[in-house]
Amino acid sequence: MSDTDELLEATTALILPLLHALDALNQAGRLMHPPALQEVVSAIGPYRDPLEEGRQVFTQVQWPEHLEAFTLHANMATTLALRAFDGFASAMDQAEPPMAAYRAMGLATQAYAAAYPLAAMLPPMNRFYLENDAREDEELQRKLMEADTEQPNVGVMHADNASDQRGGFSVYVPEYYQGETLPLVVALHGGSGHGRQFLWSWLRAV
């Protein structure tokens, strides 16, 4: 097997189960309702082990230096997703299961954020950050994949909005933005949330 084939095999081994895992965690967030917590936990449980198996394959490969950013974000997203699954799995054994599940949802949100840079590298990951009906929009996907993500003031940005800060904001500007007039969408998360995480609940819609 050539080095290229080995890298492709390792990428496939991880990215497909990672996508399935992120989709499952996203669905868990949508369906999260304390009386139905056990049902949610049972539904997403089967997606954890394939992700762990993919991670084992992925981390056994010697990755070249120019793919450092790719491997960094893939590993970060995988680790956070696995922690989210474990958080959901153990939630029913905690003193306050709903609160434990909400903490797991926070880890899932961090996994979405960690995986986002992969959207500019891999079309399947790009589609994950689109609404279902937009996943068939080839023109939109082309614009996103061809966009210059290094240009200033596009993508996901945070202003005084680290996880331990209050009073700041997070903003998303489509990576294909070229100065044209675009609508402004303002989303408020409420007093108990944090904008840095809340952004990932509405990014697909914009």
Description of each model-found segment:
Residues 176-206:
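Short substrate-entry loop that stabilizes the transition state in hydrolases
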